[in-house]
């Protein structure tokens, strides 16, 4: 039913920005099987279809963005282990920092001090909109934020998208993706993922 409600948002239909269209078409909704999908599916057989689909998206995003650091906030150990493997499959040289649900504030310091491209991976049920807004403000041009499990806490996403300027955001139902760039006009795309 979710897929049908977003049928008009398939494969980048209606997106005028060449950059955003390319990201949707070749990163978010890429259907070509990447080199590590099969191995990772064997390594994590307990992952359901949605978590496997999300993991494959993480691999493609890391492959595209080549972040120097990923900061994961609010996940349990099992989720972090699986997500770390998918992100690392896309960018083997990245540094990984995992922060539990109760320790979200140190992530803000980590994001503000580290050089290079960052990717913040946040669990929507474990954070609030105020914290996420502050985290995005500390990021630099070219950084990404993945708000995972968005379907469990839509209010956080809606509040962040409403508050922030100079972002391009993609609502993919299961997760949200924010790209930080002060030179771009604010855009929010709904994607059939």
Task: Outline where the language-model segments fall.
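Feature for secretory/organellar precursors and membrane-associated catalytic proteins
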Residues: 146
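A short alpha-helical cap/connector motif
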Residues: 1-140, 150-193
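Glycine-centered, small-residue-biased loops immediately flanking beta-strands
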Residues: 143
């Amino acid at each position: 039913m979710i897929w049908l409600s977003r049928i008009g948002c398939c494969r980048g239909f209606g997106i005028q920005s060449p950059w955003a269209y390319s990201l949707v078409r070749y990163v978010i909704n890429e259907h070509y099987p990447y080199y590590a999908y099969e191995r990772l599916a064997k390594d994590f057989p307990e992952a359901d279809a949605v978590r496997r689909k999300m993991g494959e998206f993480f691999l493609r995003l890391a492959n595209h963005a080549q972040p120097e650091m990923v900061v994961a906030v609010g996940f349990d150990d099992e989720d972090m282990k699986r997500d770390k493997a998918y992100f690392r499959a896309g960018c083997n040289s990245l540094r990984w920092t995992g922060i539990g649900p109760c320790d979200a504030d140190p992530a803000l310091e980590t994001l503000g001090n580290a050089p290079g491209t960052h990717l913040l991976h946040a669990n929507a049920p474990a954070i609030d909109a105020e914290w996420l807004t502050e985290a995005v403000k500390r990021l630099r041009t070219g950084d990404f934020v993945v708000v995972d499990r968005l379907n469990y806490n839509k209010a956080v996403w809606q509040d962040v998208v409403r508050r922030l300027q100079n972002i391009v955001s993609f609502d993919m139902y299961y997760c949200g993706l924010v790209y930080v760039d002060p030179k771009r006009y604010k855009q929010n795309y709904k994607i059939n993922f």
